Amino acid sequence: MFPYPTLNYPPMAPVNPMAYRDPNPPRRRWRPFRPPLAAQIEDLRRSIANLTFKQRAPNPPAGPPAKRKKPAPKPKPAAPKKKRQPPPAKKQKRKQKPGKRQRMCMKLESDKTFPIMLNGQVNGYACVVGGRVFKPLHVEGKIDNEQLAAIKLKKASIYDLEYGDVPQCMKSDTLQYTSEKPPGFYNWHHGAVQYENNRFTVPRGVGGKGDSGRPILDNRGRVVAIVLGGANEGSRTALSVVTWNQKGVTVKDTPEGSEPWSLTTVMCVLANITFPCDQPPCMPCCYEKNPHETLSMLEQNYDSQAYDLLLDAAVKCNGRRTRRDLETHFTQYKLARPYIADCSNCGHGRCDSPIAIEDIRGDAHAGYIRIQTSAMFGLKSDGVDLAYMSFMNGKTLKAIKIEHLYARTSAPCSLVSYHGYYILAQCPPGDTVTVGFQDGAIKHMCTIAHKVEFKPVGREKYRHPPEHGVELPCTKYTHKRADQGHYVEMHQPGLVADHSLLSMSSTKVKITVPSGSQVKYYCKCPDVKEGTTGSDYTTACTDLKQCRAYLIDNKKWVYNSGKLPRGEGETFKGKLHVPFVPVTSKCTATLAPEPLVEHKHRSLVLHLHPEHPTLLTTRALGSNARPTRQWIEQPTTVNFTVTGEGFEYTWGNHPPKRVWAQESGEGNPHGWPHEIVIYYYNRYPMTTVIGLCTCVAIIMVSCVTSVWLLCRTRNLCITPYRLAPNAQVPILLAVLCCVKPTRADDTLQVLNYLWNNNQNFFWMQTLIPLAALIVCMRMLRCLLCCGPAFLLVCGALGAAAYEHAAVMPNKVGIPYKALVERPGYAPVHLQIQLVTTKIIPSANLEYITCKYKTKVPSPVVKCCGSTQCSAKSLPDYQCQVFTGVYPFMWGGAYCFCDTENTQMSEVYIERAEECSVDQAKAYKVHTGTVQAVVNITYGSVSWRSADVYVNGETPAKIGDAKLTIGPLSSAWSPFDSKVVVYGHEVYNYDFPEYGTGKAGSFGDLQSRTLTSNDLYANTNLKLQRPQPGVVHTPYTQAPSGFERWKKDRGAPLNDIAPFGCTIALDPLRAENCAVGNIPLSIDIPDAAFTRIAETPTVSDLECKVTECTYASDFGGIATISYKASKAGNCPIHSPSGIAVIKENDVTLADSGAFTFHFSTASIHPAFKMQVCTSVVTCKGDCKPPKDHIVDYPAQHTETYTSAVSATAWSWLKVLVGSTSAFIVLGLIATAVVALVLFTHRH
């Protein structure tokens, strides 16, 4: 920031001009010793210079004042004793000055942000951005600016905004917006805002009500977002914002559960009085002062949006200073108390246990479970104490040390944390869960059946958390006790008979009332008499069995459990926050050893050595994906076929890898016949075998035919002379028919005679057929030289128009290259390369499904009477009345009657707490749009990452050029009409429609959002008759269809999609699908063209391929020599589709040569090269590549390739010519003999 170091000597006035002198100059290099006189002269010169500078120097700044000596203490006279002075006030710590970035943000915000006033207070803010004023729609009030308040605003309810044009005098002084939002930190009124994963977040507690409308700025003071609200997500708050995309279109991003941040006060109700929820009236304003009234106030506002504010105000007692974590969260559970409930297994059978297990949740990873019991932890009867737990010891509350608590499955569990009714533990796998404690010599425990298992993360089934590996998203129960928006339902406890309140006084039954309490009594002697008393009361009954006394406990809540009876009459409900809620986090997962990879010709061999069961998935990147999915448990070796289209495999938690096959092979297509056969046999084994068999068959047929013709001709010649004795054969026939001389009987004798008497003639006789064969071969070669060529050539890609149109393959990374030719101008090089392509369908969210939770309210037990069900609009609500029940409570009878009692049992479905982090979304998918990001180069202009729509209609402005691409030649999409999104995976799944879900299958629980009230459930829920002597609500239902679908969901679309598609979310899209072709049209501006007279003219072009490896990434090297009219730059391009050139242009001298690289799929390429306006043909032979498989796709097209090399064609012509020569020779001999015989006869 400061380029110069601080001076450590008094400043001097510089001599104009004076260069800066470094106080710490670099060391000088060694110099020879100077004479003493020269050194003295130099020192004198420096001293004079210093004196001159010092005379011009200004006065140095004053230094610190000198320390004064303390005077000797003088003896003071004895002063009279004064009162003790109060301690001095504590000096307040000075607030730290904000940083430069924050100061700039605050200044810009204060100048261009205006408060919105409502009833004399700030309700939100409006900001002026880009010539318009933006005001949140949910913020009521008037802008505190006369000019802006007079503007007529337009409403955009979809974005929760109002906007209008600012006056002309204010347009020059407005904030500018930007769509650039790289991940990092931004500024707003309260400090830094973090932007990551397309979300703006701030630490929890930073920002809140009244901050709606504030802008978020980048370091250059540009607005990147406008805040509308927020949602608490654990330790951070996700902001609901309005942003702009790259096209300047407004985009609203609202996290789940976000609330608008206007400062409008939410009102609560108490009886007929309304009051601000954060300021309850003084009568029930504090739980410690008025517990019953406070609970009633909370129950009446159960459904209020500001219930949390009211609960917080009631617990903190309005202005009382509290400790941060302990008092804020633990004190909520001081409104509740433990209870005794039924437990099916207490170690010795069924019992009423003080630590009965209500619920167990084990949907998190890494073996964590959350246990809900009837005991309470971290609380005592007199307040909060983390070292204690409390439970009901009969009718009294008792507290013991928490160290006596334990939990176990197949082995002891590790207690991680505890709070209220809940325990967070990490347990080993097991089929049962036991929770207990020891109170002196008495042991209390409760065991229920619940399967606990370790749930690994990712694609490897490890059994213990690893020390290191890869971080993957997972679900955990947060260790914090902070409220997370999840509640546990509470209510005031029902009446339970307490026989200790009854005693005999003389001959009458006396009811003893504890101090400050009320007791409800019910007596039958013989008339029924009931009532409520706050003091001791003596009845007219003479037997204790004739009365029941119930202690009314309306100062504490208990959990709304199905194991407790409900109070009589209309009972209101309350709620407290659930601790240890499931949240999305990061877990360390194992990373399987890398596979040992072996590359072969068109084959990939993987040697796998898993340490635990590991998933291996593969797919081909062509039109037929051929996906495979298998769990590997033992070391094994697997083989896969790899083609030029590509192959992808994913091993365990490693990222997917893609490989492509090259046209490698043994042998040499330009070598000897056996090398050619080996080469083609490795590439095309079946075709090579068929070709060789065909050649052998042709040779055999040719030889047999030739021999038969010659034999037939000879017989025709010799037969007439055999019939005439002593006939003399003409010389011509003797030569043609090889007539045996009289001195030899057969061929062997003739050859023996010639060998012994005239070897020269013997060799001449042998060479005659060979010479004839060679002559025939030459004749056939001349006939076949004009046959079909073995190379196919693509059409030229040049264009002779200002507007250039072409078709390019839809393959990412493969550039399209061409020379755009325009009359009178030099050719302009054009290159278009796809960076990414996106198929974005129109997705309509049908519903969200997740795991359900069965809610069992406390049953209504009517003693000696009947009750009935009432209709309720709850999901899958079931209600049934059972008669003839005889419940017991803690060992005593609950009712007088034996068979006239009734119980109304209720049960319904609600979302489980895990739904916030573990849910599936069902979408209906329709035809969407195709977008692409392209890199374009024309001439000397390059444009990177241009966004275009691939629809053939929407042009994109690329500098001064206009580009229109699309539509795709194939209207294809990897998505079916119905898809399911689960986490980061997408599945094609035919889910049921909304409202038609079946029990035990996908969609048994449906809702539009995670917080909406349109919850639908079908779980085959059936109520069962309660057992005698037990207060409970038994039921049966189908297992969760969502959990069943998760086990049977199969492979995600990302593992089975053809054409190498990568499936992504937000929004739902398929990226980089190599399907079809893309037509394109580009209008190139005149400025990109150069007059042909200004470019060099090239002549005498000669091209020589120096090195070539076909089917390899630019494995060809060629050199072109030239002569140019002048030096300059020339574009180079191959108009043939056989080769792809790496270079775009070259720099030419007057004469010389340049080298370029090319890629081709032909083994004998012959392609044209255009340099400026001149064209030369390059030819050469290419060798096969050495690498069988590579990790990059081919840069050339394989549509036009040579199947057979020129050398192979030459050998094939020789073979065909040789075999044909035998037939031709026989035909010639037959014709000559037939002609001679015909002439002889006539």
Swiss-Prot record:
Q: What post-translational events are described?
A: Structural polyprotein: Specific enzymatic cleavages in vivo yield mature proteins. Capsid protein is auto-cleaved during polyprotein translation, unmasking a signal peptide at the N-terminus of the precursor of E3/E2. The remaining polyprotein is then targeted to the host endoplasmic reticulum, where host signal peptidase cleaves it into pE2, 6K and E1 proteins. pE2 is further processed to mature E3 and E2 by host furin in trans-Golgi vesicle.
Q: Where is the composition biased (Basic residues)?
A: 66-104
Decide whether keyword Secreted is in the record.
no
So where does this one cross the membrane?
A: 689-709, 760-780, 781-801, 1219-1239
Q: Which InterPro entries match?
A: Alpha_E1_glycop, Alpha_E2_glycop, Alpha_E3_glycop, Alphavir_E2_A, Alphavir_E2_B, Alphavir_E2_C, Flavivir/Alphavir_Ig-like_sf, Glycoprot_cen/dimer_sf
One Gene Ontology biological process: symbiont-mediated suppression of host toll-like receptor signaling pathway
Q: Which reaction does this enzyme catalyse, per its entry?
A: Autocatalytic release of the core protein from the N-terminus of the togavirus structural polyprotein by hydrolysis of a -Trp-|-Ser- bond
Region annotated Transient transmembrane before p62-6K protein processing sits at: 717-737
- Region spans: Host transcription inhibition: 37-70
Motif Nuclear localization signal: where in chain: 67-70
Q: Which residues lie on this side of the membrane: Cytoplasmic?
A: 710-744, 1240-1242
Q: Where is this region: Functions as an uncleaved signal peptide for the precursor of protein E3/E2?
A: 262-273
Region entry Disordered, spans = 1-104
Query: Sites of glycosylation?
Result: 272
Q: Where is the Peptidase S3 domain?
A: 112-261
Supraphysiological nuclear export signal, short sequence motif: residues:
44-51
Which loops or segments lie on the Extracellular side of the membrane, by the record?
325-688, 745-759, 802-1218
The catalytic site is made up of: 138 (charge relay system), 160 (charge relay system), 212 (charge relay system)
EC number assigned by the record: 3.4.21.90
Q: Where is this region: E1 fusion peptide loop?
A: 885-902
Q: Fill in the misc note.
A: Structural polyprotein: Translated from a subgenomic RNA synthesized during togavirus replication.
**Domain topic, free-text comment:** Structural polyprotein: As soon as the capsid protein has been autocleaved, an internal uncleaved signal peptide directs the remaining polyprotein to the endoplasmic reticulum.
Q: What is this protein called?
A: Structural polyprotein
Organism of provenance: Eastern equine encephalitis virus (strain PE-3.0815) (EEEV)
